Each structure stands twice: as structure tokens, then as C-alpha cells.
């Protein structure tokens, strides 16, 4: 069948395959036409015998040219669905031949869009996909590794031996291989050989599921098996202007909200028990709650508190618990710590059925150096810059994405679309945006490279963020895109077509720092720091702001919110209630980290759960009830949210009484003309007969008082409300004469008469 030249060539090709140096196995293996006949070559390392199965028997394949290349000649093309029997060590099995399938999975249009950075559904091509080719079921593997000499699929199917399943290199640095009979749940990785011959075992960058840490393999998973029930929610969401709605977010970390005991494992639907995932090495008796358990426990809790959204700290797969999820290795996979992708889908589905939106922390700013991740992926700096002055966060020990590379940008932008489309999430919060925008972020002089204009702005990152937000709102007009941006970069929430970054909300870090600094001051000295309270209004309408008291403020020795407050316990509780009420009445959407809603005392610890036992004590119950009532009031009063980003929505009554540390203002709603009066007393003294100017005479009902007894206060107040009197003050002709409780916030609503 072969000439001597062909024999030498085939022996050489076999040697390259055996040494994992081959990038074109389809040029050697499977059906090969030679003049007017066909050669069938099967690659089967360490096999003793291989037979081609025919309708009327079988035909033995021989290996005269290389011990692992079994071949025969045929009169006709056998197609792709032929089967072979393989014998190894006395054991025989039947299978299809992977190299019979010559289909090109990534088409020309796919490659073109990917190379441009514009393939928004590239995850439909990349990764491991269960599919059927020529009536044969299996998995198509597809990977981008343009600098690799060779790539193999390794896993349970071949005892993790890279010699068995070399992939075919296509145009654009794409590698493909269809492996028959692989099924959902099978483990796999890619074995990548660099041009220098170094070997790297990598998890699938587009893997839809990964093993629970510390294991690192990817898992074959399905995309479209879950049956969603939230069509009404999704339709309504994308018809709604999210900024014209009340948004009150419960920020939380799934793994440290609440733990369970290993003695009470999760029971599957079939009655079996699930292997528990220990929550921490120091507490081996505790385990993480599963997605189904969180569905049962967390969602009713958040609904009872009245929050409109849950914000989950990163749940993309990550190897190190201590990173809080911010060092991602599995961008396309919900972490397996808590269960399966479909169980997370069911969690989101249930949130929607209970009227709760889901926001994910998304981390496109950096990635870890773990060997199985994206770092030095194909023997070159593929996803990151080679120069550490632009490619590394030394302080964080992580690498920075190369946003100038189209395929890298595509990886991230498509990832955004993936989470919204595949998991029906409602929003993202982009972490550490400032670290992306500035080339000198946390870098001393001489350790960063200026841009082409000589400045410190990272134009590539700006372009990436603009593209990401543009694509997001193009596909999902009702989405939330929230920036954690800690500088004064202009136009963070301005649309991209106006030169902005395109987010629709930005965390107000200035308000947060000013208010925490203010409340940590002894109340008797707050009179010298009134500007901390009032300054945020000066810039409030430069961006669409969200007020946040986040996880970052209750770690690393900063103390939890309650323990930031000065004074004895009574003052700590009162200060906490006053700060929360001021936050809910200040313009801007709201985000509150878990534990703050009931006065957690200890700093947040990712390896522990919240101090739920505190709810056995009335002051902590009172703070929780305060949050319940604030959220209820907030959602019921459009003046507190409808004109958050319109100057009409806020009007100072008086911000100059620093002697008494008292401020007063109105929140107004433009469509109905309704308004609320808010008065805050940030000293521990009761101010009796305190006059506050109001625009209209009449009765003002006291609809909220942080000093109410049910919240743990002294129950000082105004007997449910006050009639105004004629009194010129604060540029108004009418005034309310109020009793201001210590360390309190009052909310009053105008009514023409008491009834």
C-alpha cells in the first residue's frame, strides 16, 4: 500500500505524535485518499490489536510503520461513523475513531468575528460541547492557543495521557478535536506543548464547570438543559428604566453567609447524600450550603428584609477561598463549591419568582498566576502583557489582561454576555475599575509605562470597558452595570456614544469614606466636620451614584460597622441606625453588605459565617427591623428614589447648623410634586422645640423615627406628627417645631390635615 518514502514519512509522523509534537493529526490519521484508493489509519497508543468492524465481520489493521499507527487499505471512503475494536492487555472495547471526524467546528465567520474581538457568543464554539456528528454522540473540544506546538485533550478517557488525543490546529490558532462517547460529567484538561517543548496542563478557559478546589480539572457540562420559568420577569426587566426604580442591594458572600454541619449533609432528590465541601480547614466540622439550600434559606431572608437585589461577590470558579472570589480561573463556570451550574440557574430563577434581582461581581481587571489558569497559557504571554510594568499587579500578585489583543477582549466581553444569557443575571458590579483605568495604579515611579500621549490613562482598558458596556446594553437593555471606581475619572456613567465608559451606576466611594470618617468621630466634635456630611451633594449629579457600605469596609482591621461607632453600646446602636437611615434618605441607589443589617460585631471573615446568635438580643433585632422598615418605606415613597439623578429630587432646608450637628433637607418627586422632610441629629443630645422650615403649611406626619422603641431607641419623638406654624426660618414662611431624638433621623411627610 505504501512506498518506502511513505513508510519513512509515516514513521516520522508517528514519532511526532508519540512525542506530542504534532499539530496536524488529520493530515495523517483517519481516512486518507491515496490516488484512487483509501488508506485508513488509526492512532492507538499501547494497543495490542485494532480491527475495523464491517457489516459482515471485521478487518484487522496492521502497524508496520509505527507501533501505534494501525492501518489498512480500502476501496472506498469509509466515512466517519465506522467503528473499531481495540485490544489492550487482554481487554477489548469498541469505539468510534476520533480522527474520522474532519468537521471544522469554528467556521470562517466565527474565526473572523473572534479575530476582530466581536464574537459575542464565542462560548458557543470554544470549550467542550456535547454534540452529535454523523449520528455519533460525543464532545467537540475547541481551544485558542496560537503559540502552542501541539495540544492534546487529557482526562479520564485516556488516563490523563496526552499521547492519546492530539488536537487539530486550524486557522487563527484554534485547536479542535471531536472525541466520541465522552459524556456529561467527564473530567478533562488541555495538555499544551510550547514551541520550546515545555508542557502545561491547563483547565479550559471556556469550561462551563470545574472540580471543587483544590482539584483543578474542567468538567463536561451542558448549556441549555435548564427550563427557565422567569419569562415574565425577563420581559419586564428589559422594558424598564432601572434608574427610575428603587434599588436596594444586599451584598453578600455565598460561602460565609451561613454554614451547615458536616453531620447534616445535603440530601439529593434521589435520596443520596452529597459529598460535603468543608467551609474552612480550621473548621472541618462545617460545610458550605449548596445552591439549593441557599435557595431555601437566603432568598426568603432577603425578601423579608425588603431588598430589591442580591449582589453576589464573585462566584466564577476560583481556587483560593481567601481571594473572596476575586482571583478567577474559571470565567465561564459558577463555582462548584456550592453545586452545579443548573442549581445556580434555579437559584436565580427562584430569586426572580420572589421579585429579587441578581447582581454578580465581575472581575475583568486581573487574574491569578495559578499554573492551571490563563497565565503563560500556551508557552507565551497570551492573555497578559509580557512586560510586567503593564502586565502585572505586584501588590496583588496577579496578572493584567492584555486589552489591546482582540481575542482577549472577546473572551471577556463574551463572558459578560454569557452570564446574562445563560444565567439570567440582572446586573454586574465591575471590581477595581480604577486599577484598569490608570497605568500607574499602585505603581512607584519607573515601574509603569506612559501611554502614547505621555499620560497615565490606559486607553486600551477604556476601550474595553466601553465595548463591554455597549455590548451589554445592546443585548440586555434592562441590565445594571455598576462601577467600583474610586477616583474622579470623568464620565463613568456617561453613555459610550458621548465619550463615557457606559456604566449606568457608580459606587459613591467619596460619600462612604466621608460618612464613615464622620461617624467615627466623637459626637461632641462632629460640629467641626459638618462638611463630611454635606459635601457629597456638591458633586452628586456629576454621575449616577450608588451609595455603598461594602465588604471592603469591614475587613483588614477596619472593624465592622457597629464597632466603628464611638461611645457605649447604646450610642453605637443609635449611631448605626442614624447612619443607615441617612443613607436610605440620601440621593442614590443603595448597597449594604451582609451582617450590617443586624449589627454584626466581628469583622467579616471569609472562613466563618455571620453572627446569627446576635439576633437573640433586642438591639440587634432592632437594627434588623429598622432595615426591614427602611426598605419598605423606601420602596413605597417615590420621593426617595424617583429623582435620584435629577437635582429637583433633593433640596437642602438647612445644612449650616454645625453647632448642633443637625441637618435637614427635602426629598422630592417631580411627577406628583410630593416631598418628604428629613431631619438628622448627629449628637447624643435631645433637641427640644427645634425649628425646621417647610414650604407649605399643614400637618407633617412622622412616618419614620430611628429612635423608636421597636428599634432599640429611647422612643423620643413627635407623637406621630406636627402641624406647622407661621415662622420665618430657612427662607420659608412656615416651620415645624420638633423634638429631635439623640443620634437620630426623622422622616416626615406632608399632609394637608392630620386625617
Curated annotation (Swiss-Prot):
<feature type="active site" description="Nucleophile">
    <location>
        <position position="431"/>
    </location>
</feature>
<dbReference type="InterPro" id="IPR004193">
    <property type="entry name" value="Glyco_hydro_13_N"/>
</dbReference>
<dbReference type="GO" id="GO:0004553">
    <property type="term" value="F:hydrolase activity, hydrolyzing O-glycosyl compounds"/>
</dbReference>
<comment type="subunit">
    <text>Monomer.</text>
</comment>
<comment type="function">
    <text>Catalyzes the formation of the alpha-1,6-glucosidic linkages in glycogen by scission of a 1,4-alpha-linked oligosaccharide from growing alpha-1,4-glucan chains and the subsequent attachment of the oligosaccharide to the alpha-1,6 position.</text>
</comment>
<dbReference type="InterPro" id="IPR006048">
    <property type="entry name" value="A-amylase/branching_C"/>
</dbReference>
<dbReference type="GO" id="GO:0005829">
    <property type="term" value="C:cytosol"/>
</dbReference>
<dbReference type="Pfam" id="PF02922">
    <property type="entry name" value="CBM_48"/>
</dbReference>
<dbReference type="InterPro" id="IPR006047">
    <property type="entry name" value="Glyco_hydro_13_cat_dom"/>
</dbReference>
<feature type="active site" description="Proton donor">
    <location>
        <position position="484"/>
    </location>
</feature>
<dbReference type="GO" id="GO:0003844">
    <property type="term" value="F:1,4-alpha-glucan branching enzyme activity"/>
</dbReference>
<dbReference type="InterPro" id="IPR054169">
    <property type="entry name" value="GlgB_N"/>
</dbReference>
<comment type="pathway">
    <text>Glycan biosynthesis; glycogen biosynthesis.</text>
</comment>
<dbReference type="InterPro" id="IPR013783">
    <property type="entry name" value="Ig-like_fold"/>
</dbReference>
<dbReference type="InterPro" id="IPR017853">
    <property type="entry name" value="Glycoside_hydrolase_SF"/>
</dbReference>
<keyword id="KW-0119">Carbohydrate metabolism</keyword>
<dbReference type="InterPro" id="IPR014756">
    <property type="entry name" value="Ig_E-set"/>
</dbReference>
<keyword id="KW-0320">Glycogen biosynthesis</keyword>
<dbReference type="InterPro" id="IPR037439">
    <property type="entry name" value="Branching_enzy"/>
</dbReference>
<dbReference type="InterPro" id="IPR044143">
    <property type="entry name" value="GlgB_N_E_set_prok"/>
</dbReference>
<keyword id="KW-0321">Glycogen metabolism</keyword>
<dbReference type="InterPro" id="IPR013780">
    <property type="entry name" value="Glyco_hydro_b"/>
</dbReference>
<dbReference type="GO" id="GO:0005978">
    <property type="term" value="P:glycogen biosynthetic process"/>
</dbReference>
<keyword id="KW-0328">Glycosyltransferase</keyword>
<dbReference type="GO" id="GO:0043169">
    <property type="term" value="F:cation binding"/>
</dbReference>
<dbReference type="InterPro" id="IPR006407">
    <property type="entry name" value="GlgB"/>
</dbReference>
<dbReference type="Pfam" id="PF02806">
    <property type="entry name" value="Alpha-amylase_C"/>
</dbReference>
<dbReference type="Pfam" id="PF00128">
    <property type="entry name" value="Alpha-amylase"/>
</dbReference>
<keyword id="KW-0808">Transferase</keyword>
<comment type="similarity">
    <text>Belongs to the glycosyl hydrolase 13 family. GlgB subfamily.</text>
</comment>
<protein>
    <recommendedName>
        <fullName>1,4-alpha-glucan branching enzyme GlgB</fullName>
        <ecNumber>2.4.1.18</ecNumber>
    </recommendedName>
</protein>
<dbReference type="Pfam" id="PF22019">
    <property type="entry name" value="GlgB_N"/>
</dbReference>
Amino acid at each position: 500500500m505504501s512506498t518506502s518514502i511513505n513508510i519513512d514519512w509515516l514513521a516520522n509522523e508517528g514519532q511526532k505524535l508519540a512525542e506530542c509534537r504534532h499539530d496536524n493529526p488529520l493530515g495523517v490519521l483517519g481516512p486518507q485518499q491515496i490516488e484512487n484508493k483509501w488508506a485508513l489509519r488509526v492512532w492507538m497508543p499501547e494497543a495490542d490489536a485494532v480491527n475495523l468492524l464491517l457489516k459482515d465481520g471485521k478487518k484487522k489493521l496492521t502497524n508496520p510503520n509505527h507501533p501505534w499507527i494501525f492501518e489498512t487499505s480500502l476501496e472506498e471512503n469509509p466515512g466517519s461513523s465506522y467503528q473499531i475494536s481495540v485490544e489492550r492487555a487482554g481487554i477489548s472495547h469498541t469505539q468510534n475513531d476520533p480522527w474520522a471526524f474532519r468537521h471544522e467546528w469554528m467556521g470562517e465567520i466565527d474565526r473572523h468575528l473572534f479575530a476582530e474581538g466581536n464574537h459575542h457568543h464565542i462560548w458557543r464554539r470554544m470549550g467542550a460541547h456535547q454534540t452529535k456528528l454523523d449520528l455519533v454522540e460525543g464532545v467537540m473540544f475547541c481551544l485558542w492557543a496560537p503559540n502552542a506546538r501541539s495540544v492534546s485533550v487529557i482526562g479520564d478517557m485516556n488516563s490523563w495521557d496526552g499521547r492519546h488525543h492530539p488536537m487539530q490546529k486550524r486557522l487563527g490558532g484554534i485547536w479542535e478535536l471531536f472525541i466520541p462517547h465522552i459524556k456529561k460529567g467527564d473530567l478533562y484538561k488541555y495538555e499544551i506543548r510550547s514551541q520550546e517543548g515545555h508542557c502545561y496542563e491547563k483547565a479550559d478557559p471556556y469550561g462551563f464547570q470545574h472540580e471543587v478546589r483544590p482539584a483543578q480539572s474542567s468538567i463536561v457540562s451542558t448549556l441549555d438543559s435548564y427550563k427557565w420559568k422567569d419569562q415574565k420577569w425577563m420581559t419586564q426587566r428589559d422594558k424598564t428604566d432601572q434608574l427610575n426604580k428603587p434599588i436596594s442591594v444586599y451584598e453578600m458572600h455565598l460561602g460565609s453567609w451561613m454554614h451547615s454541619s458536616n453531620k447534616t449533609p445535603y440530601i439529593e432528590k434521589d435520596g443520596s447524600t452529597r459529598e460535603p465541601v468543608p467551609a474552612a480547614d480550621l473548621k472541618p466540622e462545617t460545610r458550605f450550603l449548596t445552591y439549593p439550600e441557599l435557595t431555601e434559606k437566603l432568598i426568603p431572608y432577603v425578601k423579608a428584609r425588603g431588598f430589591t437585589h442580591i449582589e453576589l461577590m464573585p462566584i466564577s470558579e476560583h481556587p483560593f477561598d481567601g481571594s473572596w472570589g476575586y482571583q478567577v480561573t474559571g470565567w465561564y463556570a459558577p463555582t462548584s463549591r456550592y453545586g452545579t451550574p443548573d442549581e445556580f440557574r434555579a437559584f436565580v430563577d427562584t430569586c426572580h419568582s420572589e421579585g429579587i434581582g441578581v447582581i454578580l461581581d465581575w472581575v475583568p481587571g486581573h487574574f491569578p498566576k495559578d499554573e492551571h489558569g490563563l497565565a503563560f497559557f500556551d508557552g507565551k504571554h497570551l492573555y497578559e502583557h509580557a512586560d510586567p510594568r503593564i502586565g502585572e499587579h505586584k501588590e496583588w500578585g496577579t496578572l493584567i489582561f492584555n486589552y489591546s489583543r482582540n481575542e482577549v477582549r472577546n473572551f471577556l466581553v463574551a463572558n459578560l454576555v454569557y452570564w446574562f444569557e445563560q444565567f439570567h443575571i440582572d446586573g454586574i458590579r465591575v471590581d477595581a475599575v480604577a486599577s484598569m483605568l490608570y497605568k500607574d495604579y499602585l505603581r512607584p515611579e519607573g515601574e509603569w509605562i506612559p501611554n502614547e500621549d505621555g499620560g497615565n490613562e490606559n486607553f486600551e482598558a477604556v476601550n474595553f470597558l466601553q465595548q463591554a458596556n455597549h455590548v451589554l446594553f445592546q443585548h440586555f437593555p434592562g441590565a445594571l452595570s455598576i462601577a467600583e471606581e474610586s477616583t474622579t475619572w470623568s464620565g463613568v456613567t456617561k453613555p459610550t456614544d458621548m465619550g463615557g465608559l457606559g456604566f449606568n451606576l457608580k459606587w459613591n466611594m467619596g460619600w462612604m469614606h466621608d460618612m464613615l470618617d464622620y461617624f467615627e468621630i466623637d459626637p461632641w466634635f462632629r460640629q467641626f466636620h459638618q462638611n463630611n456630611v454635606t459635601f457629597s451633594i456638591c458633586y452628586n449629579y456629576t454621575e449616577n451614584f450608588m451609595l455603598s457600605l461594602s465588604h471592603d469596609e469591614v475587613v483588614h482591621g477596619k472593624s465592622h460597622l457597629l464597632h466603628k461607632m464611638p461611645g457605649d453600646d447604646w450610642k453605637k446602636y443609635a449611631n448605626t441606625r442614624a447612619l443607615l437611615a441617612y443613607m436610605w434618605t440620601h440621593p442614590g441607589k443603595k448597597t449594604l453588605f451582609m451582617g450590617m443589617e443586624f449589627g454584626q460585631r466581628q469583622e467579616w471573615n471569609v472562613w466563618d459565617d455571620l453572627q446569627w446568635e446576635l439576633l437573640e438580643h433586642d438591639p440587634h433585632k432592632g437594627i434588623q427591623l429598622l432595615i426591614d422598615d427602611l426598605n419598605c418605606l423606601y420602596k413605597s415613597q417615590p420621593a426617595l428614589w424617583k429623582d435620584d439623578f435629577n437635582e429637583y429630587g433633593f433640596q437642602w432646608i438647612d445644612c449650616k447648623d454645625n453647632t448642633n450637628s443637625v441637618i435637614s433637607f427635602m426629598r422630592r418627586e417631580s411627577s406628583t410634586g410630593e416631598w418628604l422632610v428629613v431631619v438628622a441629629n448627629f449628637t447624643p443630645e435631645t433637641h427640644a422645640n427645634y425649628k425646621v422650615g417647610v414650604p407649605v403649611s399643614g400637618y407633617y406626619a412622622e412616618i419614620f423615627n430611628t429612635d423608636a422603641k421597636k428599634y432599640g431607641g429611647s422612643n423620643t419623638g413627635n407623637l406621630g406628627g406636627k402641624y406647622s406654624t407661621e415662622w420665618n426660618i430657612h427662607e420659608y414662611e412656615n416651620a415645624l417645631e420638633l423634638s429631635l431624638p439623640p443620634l437620630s433621623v426623622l422622616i416626615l411627610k406632608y399632609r394637608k390635615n392630620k386625617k
